[in-house]
């Protein structure tokens, strides 16, 4: 690190976790239940939290729906899909306890969403004023041109490593692996804020008891880390020589999943978003239907930020939106480009263009992004943004030209 500081470089780190991490198990269960409910009732109101510990899954929350889903079966099927299918790995979806404690959504909250403050005060102007935000809060979105997906490179690489770690386990490319795991990537950034060197990669993976750490290191390096670095094509833009690789630096990792640590929905919000490169409003995503602006507002902000960068208006963009519970119109919007704006544009000019091009009322977001669909379970692990393996509507850059037109950039 001292050599890095002396060279004027700064280190930035992001982490990811696999779908077998206890918190991610809970996110996956919550979003699987959400998707199932949206499949039978697209207008279902859902707020589902999951807790897991040794031998037990507990599902709690509030739901308003005209449909029915068999939650215990959804829980068990998801656990087995992840890989917790035997007591030998520390958790068995077929035999674990599953308890469900779900009540009805508060009528007061429901009323504020169904009939906004604008409607109740006579301020409404069109149908999109009808629905109020499901809660107060602030949400951030971010984009940067340092990767093809317009995501920060540290979290992008960390997710790719975590996905590959799961892939080699499920396809038996590497034997003796178990579902729980984490990845971490440290990159050196130069004075202009560009990533220039891979500094450290950490991979921690649950494994069977009869493997040596030397064997595991070789397998992870060849089939996970080296594979991802080749697949990413970073050699031409990033110095990947001489990086430090740490595999299970704490030693043996046999006990994992819910047997190793209790899990809870919504505890990996930095993994879910930008790996710490951008600010976060604090609200989690999983288990929440899109009337909850914690989710839909954050997705809209990624959509906005990505279009700003895709339009060439800035190299980096962070946007914030804020809502009041029961109000349709946002109470605030903020755009920050960190001095990277192009064409002599100010952040205020870009902000005005965003307000002209994007309708950020919850009903409009839900309609424009078509969010009343079962599209959420796939986002529960490996990030909600920058996913080139999923077709997520908030990743579209369909408003980039409109932003340029509003700013008379042609």
From Swiss-Prot:
Gene3D superfamilies found in the cross-reference section:
3.30.300.10
| Catalyzed reaction equations | L-methionine + ATP + H2O = S-adenosyl-L-methionine + phosphate + diphosphate
* Keyword annotations: ATP-binding, Cytoplasm, Magnesium, Metal-binding, Nucleotide-binding, One-carbon metabolism, Potassium, Transferase
Kindly list the positions annotated as binding L-methionine: 62, 105, 261, 292
Indicate where this protein is primarily found. cytoplasm
Enumerate the InterPro entries for this protein: ADOMET_SYNTHASE_CS, S-AdoMet_synt_C, S-AdoMet_synt_central, S-AdoMet_synt_N, S-AdoMet_synthetase, S-AdoMet_synthetase_sfam
GO terms under biological process:
one-carbon metabolic process; S-adenosylmethionine biosynthetic process
Q: Residue span of the signal peptide, if any?
A: none
Record keyword Phosphoprotein present: no
Sorted alphabetically, which PROSITE patterns does this protein's record hold? Answer: ADOMET_SYNTHASE_1 (PS00376), ADOMET_SYNTHASE_2 (PS00377)
Kindly list the positions annotated as binding K(+): 49
**Which sites bind Mg(2+)?**
23
Cofactor note as given = Binds 2 divalent ions per subunit. Binds 1 potassium ion per subunit.
The annotated pathway is: Amino-acid biosynthesis; S-adenosyl-L-methionine biosynthesis; S-adenosyl-L-methionine from L-methionine: step 1/1
Broad class of enzyme this protein falls into? transferase
What this protein needs as a cofactor is: Mg(2+); K(+)
Cellular compartments annotated? Cytoplasm
Name the domain of life: Bacteria
EC number(s) per UniProt? 2.5.1.6
Q: Name one GO cellular component term.
A: cytoplasm
Residues annotated for ATP binding in this entry: 21, 180-182, 261, 267-268, 284, 288
Subunit and interaction comment: Homotetramer; dimer of dimers.
* Family statement: Belongs to the AdoMet synthase family.
Q: Please name the HAMAP family in this protein's record.
A: S_AdoMet_synth1
Describe its function.
Catalyzes the formation of S-adenosylmethionine (AdoMet) from methionine and ATP. The overall synthetic reaction is composed of two sequential steps, AdoMet formation and the subsequent tripolyphosphate hydrolysis which occurs prior to release of AdoMet from the enzyme.
The protein here is known as S-adenosylmethionine synthase
User: What broad taxonomic lineage does this protein's source fall under?
Assistant: Bacteria, Bacillati, Actinomycetota, Actinomycetes, Mycobacteriales
């Amino acid at each position: 690190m001292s050599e890095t500081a002396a060279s004027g470089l700064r280190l930035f780190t992001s982490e990811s976790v696999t779908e077998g991490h206890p918190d991610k198990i809970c996110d996956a269960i919550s979003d699987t239940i959400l998707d199932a409910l949206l499949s039978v009732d697209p207008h279902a109101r859902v707020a589902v939290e999951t807790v897991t510990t040794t031998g037990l899954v507990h599902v709690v929350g509030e739901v308003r729906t005209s449909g029915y889903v068999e939650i215990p079966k959804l829980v068990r099927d998801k656990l087995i899909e992840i890989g917790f299918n035997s007591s030998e790995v520390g958790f068995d979806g077929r035999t674990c306890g599953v308890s469900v404690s779900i009540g009805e959504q508060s009528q007061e909250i429901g009323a504020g969403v169904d009939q906004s403050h604008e409607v109740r005060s006579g301020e409404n102007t069109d149908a999109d004023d009808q629905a109020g935000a499901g809660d107060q809060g602030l949400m951030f979105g971010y984009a940067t041109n340092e990767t093809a997906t317009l995501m920060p490179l540290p979290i992008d690489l960390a997710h790719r490593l975590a996905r590959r770690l799961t892939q080699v386990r499920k396809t038996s490319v590497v034997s003796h692996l178990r579902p729980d795991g984490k990845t971490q990537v440290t990159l050196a950034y130069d004075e202009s804020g560009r990533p220039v060197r891979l500094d450290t990669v950490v991979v921690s993976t649950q494994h069977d008891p009869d493997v040596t750490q030397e064997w595991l290191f070789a397998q992870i390096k060849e089939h996970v880390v080296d594979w991802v670095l080749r697949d990413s094509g970073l050699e031409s833009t990033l110095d990947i020589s001489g990086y430090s690789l740490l595999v299970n630096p704490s030693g043996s990792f046999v006990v994992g999943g819910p047997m190793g640590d209790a899990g809870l929905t919504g505890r990996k919000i930095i993994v879910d978003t930008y790996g710490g490169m951008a600010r976060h409003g604090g609200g989690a995503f999983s288990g929440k239907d899109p009337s909850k602006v914690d989710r839909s507002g954050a997705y809209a902000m990624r959509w906005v930020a990505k279009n700003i960068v895709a339009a060439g208006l800035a190299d980096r963009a962070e946007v914030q939106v804020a809502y009041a519970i029961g109000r349709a119109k946002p109470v605030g919007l903020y755009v920050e480009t960190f001095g990277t704006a192009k064409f002599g544009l100010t952040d205020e000019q870009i902000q005005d263009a965003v307000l002209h091009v994007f309708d950020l009322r919850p009903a409009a977001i839900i309609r424009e992004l078509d969010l009343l669909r079962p599209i959420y379970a796939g986002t529960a692990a490996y990030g909600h943004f920058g996913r080139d393996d999923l077709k997520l509507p908030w990743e579209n850059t369909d408003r980039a030209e409109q932003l340029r037109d509003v700013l008379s950039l042609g």
